[in-house]
A protein has these predicted regions:
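N-terminal nicking endonuclease/strand-transfer module with a His-rich metal-binding environment
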Residues: 1-309
Length: 309
């Protein structure tokens, strides 16, 4: 499970696009239709698009014109985690596509994932360093569960001509986006997940207030909560995510694993390949063939281990 803060882009004037209305983002997230494809909140299962925009855009008291008014978060389970969630909800094992489920089963899976997102928004609130304990009830937010992902120009498959931009990605693609207001529901507390200065104190409306947000705390807690809530046992590579405090160390472990598996795989191919021509291709491959081989091998290793980065 990877929880992500999508950092705001800047416009041509260098001002964050999140300093304005959320209308473009809300309409973008409204793109999918079907079972369970509604905005939801802490206490509502279905919220109209117009209400989402109106409430987020009007919850900005004390914020300056150039300050972010909202943020987008996403909760992204691995395909292995999604399959586990489906089994917990429906009893069906080894599901590789939502199309194999009935409409009622899909509705149950989406509803359960919505509840998990609600839990994660509680976790998000708790990881702000404030004078009082916060919960999702203190936040103004709206979520949207999606079941599809599309290939973009950034994907290697598109760059290599194997897929076209806009093609649907295969497999289980369940995930959720959240629009969360920077201000709390009382419009007296500013909550920026970009603030890293845990423990600092600023003055807001004449009062001293603590600030800061623990990004790592939020991500790790959400990751662990999935396991606790659904009895999910993470594999070894997923456990690196919250046991290893050094990203460089984690990165090196993955790089070494990839190199080791690629070399072992090539040794096996040398043993089984016969004929002078095939041996020559392995010992003296073209740059293009090596590039394609390594890309596919690395992708397979990452998919097999369900990495959370």
């Amino acid at each position: 499970m990877y929880s992500k803060l999508h950092r705001p882009e800047k416009n041509e004037l260098g001002v964050s696009v999140n300093a304005g209305s959320c209308v473009k983002l809300a309409h973008y997230l409204d793109k999918e239709s079907g079972i369970g494809k509604f905005f939801f909140s802490q206490n509502q299962d279905s919220v109209p698009l117009t209400e989402v925009i109106q409430k987020i855009d009007n919850n900005k008291k004390t914020l300056k014109n150039n300050q972010d008014k909202f943020y987008m978060l996403s909760y992204n389970p691995s395909q292995r985690e999604i399959a586990h969630l489906i089994k917990e909800v429906t009893g069906k094992d080894n599901v590789v596509a939502l199309s194999s489920l009935t409409d009622k089963e899909i509705e149950k899976v989406v509803s359960e994932f919505q509840d998990y997102v609600r839990d994660c928004m509680d976790i998000y609130a708790r990881n702000f360093n404030r004078n009082k304990d916060l919960s999702s009830e203190d936040l103004l937010w709206f979520g949207r569960v999606e079941t599809e992902r599309h290939y973009t120009y950034l994907d290697e498959e598109v760059k290599d001509g194997l897929r076209s931009k806009g093609d649907l990605k295969e497999g289980l693609q369940l995930h959720a986006h959240v629009i969360v207001s920077r201000m709390d529901v009382t419009q007296t507390i500013s909550l920026s997940p970009l603030a890293k200065s845990m423990g600092n104190v600023n003055v807001l409306n004449g009062k001293a207030v603590k600030n800061g947000f623990s990004m790592k705390g939020w991500q790790v807690d959400c990751f662990q909560h999935f396991g606790n809530k659904y009895g999910y046992i993470a594999n070894a590579d997923e456990r690196f995510y919250y046991h290893d405090s050094s990203y460089s160390s984690y990165k090196n472990k993955i790089q070494n694993k990839i190199i080791h598996e690629v070399m072992e795989d090539m040794k096996e191919e040398r043993q089984f390949m016969t004929g002078a021509r095939n041996i020559t291709l392995i010992l003296h491959p073209t740059k293009k063939s090596v590039k394609l081989y390594l890309k596919q091998k690395i992708k397979n290793i990452l998919l097999e281990n369900e990495l959370v980065i």
